[in-house]
Each structure stands twice: as C-alpha cells, then as structure tokens.
Amino acid sequence: MTTHSGPARHPAVVPDVDALVSRYVTPGTHLHLAMTMARPNAMVYALARQFAGRGAFTVSTSATHTAMHALTMSGAVDHLITCFLGDTYPTPRPNPLYRDLARGEPFTCELWSLLSFTQRLTAGATGLPYGVTASLVGSDLERGLAAGGRGPLPGGDGGTADGTPKFVRMADPHGTDRTFGLVEPLRPDLTLLHGACADRRGNIVLVPPAGEGAWAAYAARRGVLASVERIVPDAFVDAHPERVVIPGQRVVALCEAPLGAHPQSLRGLSTGEATQDITGYRDDYAFLTELVESLATEDGAKEWYREWVEEPGSHAAYLRKLGPARRAELTLDARPLSPRAPVTPPRDPAPPFTARPPRAAATPRPRPEPRTPVSRQERTVILGARAIVQRVTEDGYDTLLAGIGVSHLAAWLAAARLREQGVRVPVCAELGFYGMDPEPGDVFLFSQLHATRSQQLAGITEILGGMVAGNRRCLGVLAAGEVDSRGDINTSLLADGRWLTGSGGANDIATSTDCLVLSTASPRKFVERVAYVTSPGARVREVVSHFGRFRRDGGAGSPFRLATWLPPGYDGPATPQEAVAQLTRWPAPTSGCVPEPEVTQAEVAWLRSLDPQGFYR
C-alpha cells in the first residue's frame, strides 16, 4: 500500500522564462513543446540561450517551425519526434535547416502524422500500454516507425534504430479487411506550454483553438512548465472554473511572459471585467517573413539567431526590441473585424457567381490590378474549387477539411460558391477550426482572424478524429510536393535526399476519407512514382492541375484519366495530349476529356480579395 502525507504543494512562481528553464530543465531531458495556437516560444528561446550546444534533448512537438528553428540552430536537440519540419508562412515550404534530415542532420528524427501523434499523447495521458490509430497504414511513415523510428530515413544513413517498433500493424479481430495500428504511448519528462493566464495555484486557462489540448500536460512524467500572459488572483479562476484546461496539480512551475507566444498568436480572453481581460495578439507576419528570408542562407540564419536569441538575453529585452508600436499593432480584437454576411437562399436557382466584396482587414494591403494575368497557381485553385463544388453537389459531402496551401484557398473559394447556391458546407482546419469564414486579406490558414470568424473552436482530436476519420461524408482537400499515377502523395522526402516538410495532418486525412489533391503540373511534381509515400492514394478521387482535372472512374487503384481541359495559356501545350505528355509523367488517357469553362473575373477577384499580396501567385 502506498501512503502519502503532507499538504498539497503549489507550483513555484519564478521571475521569468530563463529562470524557469534553467532551474527545472537538465540536459538529456525529454521535453514536449505543447501544440496549441499559442506555442511556448518565449521558453523555446530561453532553452536555446541556456542550453546551446549542451542540451542533448529529446524534443517532441507536432510541428517544427518558427521559434523552434532557434532551438534547432542552438544545437541543443539530439533527437526530434514530430510531424512537420519547415515553414508555414507566407506559404508552406521547406526550410534549409532540415535539408539533410535523411542523413541525420541536424538531429535524428522520428516522423508521425498529426492525429497519430496526438493519439500517442492521449495513450500516455490515460495510462494505456498502446494507442490505436487508423492512420499511417501503407505509408513510408509506417515503414520507418515499424523499424524503430529513430532513423535512418529512406535514402539516408543518419541515426541508429533503437530496435523497438513504434508502430505495429494489426488485423481487424472481427475479420474485415481493415487494418489499423498500435502506437507507443508518448510520455515526455516535462511539457512546456504557454497559456492565457493562471493563478498561483497553477490552474492554467488556455483559449481555443486547442490544438492538442491538455493531453501532453497529463502525459508528462514530471509535469508542466508554464508561461502565461498574466498571473491572476485565485478568485478569478474560482469564478471561472470552466476556463481552466490544465489543473494546478500537473504544474511544476510557472512565470509570466507577456507576448510569450510571439511571433505566433494568442487568442484573448474577455471576462466582462475590463481589468481582468487578457489581450490577444495576431501572428506577426512581418517577423515571420523576415525569419524565412533570413534562414534562406547560412549567414542570414546566424545573424537572425544573434539578433533575436543571443543578444536580447531575456524575454523582457526581446519585448523591448519589438517595441510598443509593434506590440500595439498586433493587438487582436476579441470580436470579428467585420460581421459575417447573412446567408439567405438565393432567389435565382442558378445565380451567377459574384465576388464577395472585401471587408476591413487588420492591416490595409494593396490589391493587385484586376487585369493582372492569372497565374498557374491561381488557375489550380479555381479548378480545384470547381471540383469541390461538383463533388459536394453530386456526392453529398457535408464537410471540407482544408490542408494548408493552395488546398485551403480552393476549399474557401468552393464554400463561398456553394453558399451563393444556398448550400452550407463547413470548412475545417486541423488545429481546431470548424465552420471557417475567412477574413479577406489574410491568406494564412491558421490566422486568429479566421478563428474569430469560425462557428466552433475545438482541437485536433475533434477535427481530424470526429469530423474527418469518424465522418464518412467529409471531403479532404490536400496539396502535394509530388503526386503519382496511383494517387500517392509525397510531402516529405525527394529522391535526391532533400527534405520537404512532412505529413502534418495530410496522412490522417488521406487514410480516412475521400480526397482531392491540388498541384500545379510539371514533370517534377506529377511523377511516375513518388520518392516517399507520405499519404497513400487509395482514397484520392481527383487530382487537379492548372490545365485540367484528373479523375478516377472506378474505386481505389483504378487509373486516372484527364477528365477536363483548360488550355494553360500562350506558353503552354496546345492539346490535352500534349499537356499530359509535357507536364506530367503519367500514362493518363485523354479520351472523353471535356472543355473546362474559362476562368472568370469573379473567381479571380474573390481569390485575390483573400490573397491581395499575391503569395499564391
């Protein structure tokens, strides 16, 4: 029998993030960086300062981007467990830091999909010997994890497998042909997270979208290190117990860190009492753009690291460097910037599509000239939106899951077109957005401005689990680095060993629901066989290019044919046959191909109202 004595402890309250990590983190620790919309970036910078070159950490985090690049550059990470390595703004793209990941540089890496990663945390949090997932089966992710998961990646020589399978494929005990996987629980030593506020007892308020939610806090063997925007009186939490997501019993120590998620965002907390409100802030797009540009070269990366990590020396100095004007500009209103347009059934059963007028964005941005030529990416988005509209109206899908990139723009545009026809189809995003109504002028999928305009704010499990894997009427919309004639998708690793970005939630979507895939066509993207199967293509219904739509007439494994044709312009092939031959490596027939209607000015205007800066041109 185990006995316990003594009063319940309260977490330590320390002065700042540097004191927090230096007192409670030791080299060799397994640290988990919690994946919510407000990531613990101030603590990540502190880890880089305090443990540069000597951390030898195992780090688990579902996405490796933004401030995590600083921890990579510090040399403090020995092994990484993740789902994505790259950049997400202004567009999803590889980051040079991870180019040689297949060779074990800058660390060994264990790769998962977003839902299976979260299911591992759930298993760890609830004391289960395994988690269960329907993701990963049939992909190169499965093959790597079944071999031990510590490396090497296909085509490389980095790392040494630890011999313990992280994923074991299982047959359905009821005798169906469906297979699933048992996954090893994820149990870090410490979970680091950033919250909106906490009391001195350690009760932490998180504001949705929740991402992975509280699972990592419960899974951590030693507990949680937390930074918060503000430490509030106990009475505040006692009056709002429904807002507490992490109980104080799980918290080892905490500190205040205003703007602790910068350059990412935090949704504010309105209490009805102005003195107790927690002010939210938007993603700092200027900072994120500067970061991506700086890390494009080795010298630029060193200079950025010196300027923003080493020289400030503390979070307080980091905030002073940002300056009050910049901080004020990032302030997020608790309400939508502009009201939702009322949705009423159209009088005309087949009204012409008209562009929704742009509404006030957070920062006014110049709009492109209306006669600017339509780019290949824009044509891909528009044809993708048309494909989505047709699939929804003909096949009865009731939900769209938007992946990041051209795919989420196509989903947004399709939802707008359907809305004008009196059909409401909610658009979801993997971190917890449901029923998004995007703010014109903000093209970033995970913007807090879109959260403010959503019907529900939930988490990864609710969206990728409940709304995708558990919903037979969801249509996934994905982008691809490579896509082959079987529909297999690669967003991970090229044949020459260069790293792309990884799965994120794409594998979870492709293995559980019907999908459309969007990509501008070239022989480099439309390949005979992908170099790495990030997402199996059995459930891909269509692949949309800038010159037409490839469609399967049969089920999984049936061949694609070019079903529609939109001449790609004066500089492109003149016939469907020439386009397939010159712009793909697919053996796709073109018989029965029908003309695609010309791109309209209304379609282009609507798309550019979302993307006035032309990131997707």
Give the ranges of each region predicted by the language model:
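Polybasic, low-complexity association/targeting segments
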Residues: 425-442
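Structure-specific endonuclease nuclease cores
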Residues: 376-380
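Conserved phosphate- and dinucleotide-binding cores of soluble alpha/beta proteins
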Residues: 2-23, 35-50, 67-371, 382, ...
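A generic "binding-loop/recognition-motif" signal
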Residues: 64, 210, 406
